[in-house]
């Protein structure tokens, strides 16, 4: 990673983005592409074909040693002991005060080696938290500056990538598994994961290999996509964004992440979260579909029929796939029944909306 004079870092693909005419913006300490040809076009390329994203700003930590699993189990809410080598798990790190330090991916390299992939904005905070909780003889190393990461997403991804990858039958690679391989002549870690809801892979490689792999993907027909499309894609899929839908004040139970909160063993905040799961919470994260024209945005009030505020939008957009406003937000449990009608306060107008589960696309 390179740093600029104004302290913004640049990924190994920075020059590639400029050549493609990307609109660059500051994002979590990096200069990152928000769009190339346009958000809507990029969004549809991922839903219908194959798009690529530079997500090298993400953080990667390596936890190793005979007691590595003990540390991973303690700091994360999911059950990492269920992972075999080559498997990935979505999880979160409770903060001991009812909230979330970060959500993350846990890669099981072996029972004595794990790679944690964390949000760029939380890299320093996460590393400090993990090391503060390391009461075992586990080695924790921040490898974030050593890796580039390209997300290759969409239904055509396996077919596009296969001629240039030495892993056979990519289309049969199970979701949330990974394997080392060679892509466009370079060593890489190929992970069947993503943040778009359209399938695909995430490729981890050393910085010097990133421009060549990126160029190879473009020549093979992939569309370059920016952070703008990444956000609309993840919101349509109902995926939480740290800092919007989850943070230090929201619990995984409130956020609908009970499915990654397992109680087989002890972990940070275990008893508190178990009580929440059994007794329920005062608010819950729900999805909202606008019934009339209007784009819901973060911070907008959610109101009942009496005009009382019963919640707040945490993420919202005009869905490129559906052509209507969609959002996620926290709402009082008493008003959170699926199918219930509420209103979103957009400027001076109360625009009707329906309460739905997060995840707005038809199931395929």
Model-predicted segments: where are they?
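Acidic, proline/glycine-enriched N-terminal capping motif
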Residues: 1-91, 99-101, 228
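Conserved, structured C-terminal
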Residues: 1-28, 33-34, 40, 109-364
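Membrane-targeting and insertion segments and their boundary/processing signals
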Residues: 42-46, 97-100, 104, 184-191
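N-terminal glycine-rich flavin-associated loop
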Residues: 55-66, 107-115, 153
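Internal amphipathic helical hairpin motif
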Residues: 66-100, 157-186
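Well-ordered mid-protein domain cores that form the structural environment of catalytic cofactors
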Residues: 79-133
């Amino acid at each position: 990673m390179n740093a600029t004079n104004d302290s913004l870092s640049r990924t190994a693909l920075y020059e590639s983005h400029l050549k493609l005419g990307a609109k660059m913006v500051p994002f979590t300490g990096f200069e990152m592409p928000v769009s190339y040809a346009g958000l809507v076009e990029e969004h549809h390329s991922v839903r219908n074909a194959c798009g690529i994203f530079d997500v090298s700003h993400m953080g990667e930590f390596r936890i190793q040693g005979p007691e590595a699993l003990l540390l991973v189990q303690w700091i994360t809410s999911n059950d990492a002991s269920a992972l075999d080598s080559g498997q990935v798990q979505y999880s979160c790190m409770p903060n001991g005060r009812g909230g979330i330090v970060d959500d993350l991916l846990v890669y099981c390299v072996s029972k004595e080696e794990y790679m944690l992939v964390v949000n760029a904005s939380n890299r320093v905070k996460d590393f400090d938290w993990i090391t503060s909780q390391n009461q075992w003889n586990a080695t924790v190393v921040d490898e974030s500056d050593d890796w580039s990461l390209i997300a290759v997403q969409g239904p055509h991804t396996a077919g596009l990538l296969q001629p240039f990858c030495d892993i056979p039958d990519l289309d049969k690679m199970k979701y949330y598994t990974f394997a080392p391989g060679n892509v466009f002549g370079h060593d890489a870690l190929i992970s069947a994961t993503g943040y778009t809801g359209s399938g695909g892979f995430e490729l981890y490689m050393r910085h010097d290999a990133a421009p060549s792999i990126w160029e190879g993907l473009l020549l093979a027909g992939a569309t370059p996509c920016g952070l703008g499309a990444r956000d609309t894609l993840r919101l349509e899929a109902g995926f939480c964004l740290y800092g919007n839908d989850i943070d230090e004040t929201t619990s995984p139970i409130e956020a609908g992440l009970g499915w990654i909160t397992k109680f087989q063993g002890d972990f940070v905040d275990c008893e508190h979260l178990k009580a929440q799961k059994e007794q329920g919470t005062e608010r819950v994260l729900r999805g909202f579909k606008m019934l009339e024209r209007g784009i819901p945005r973060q911070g907008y009030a959610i109101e009942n029929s009496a005009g009382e505020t019963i919640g707040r939008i945490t993420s919202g957009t005009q869905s490129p796939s559906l052509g209507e406003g969609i959002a996620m937000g926290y709402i009082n449990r008493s008003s959170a029944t699926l199918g219930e009608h509420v209103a979103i306060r957009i400027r001076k107008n109360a625009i009707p909306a329906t309460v739905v589960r997060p995840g707005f696309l038809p199931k395929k």
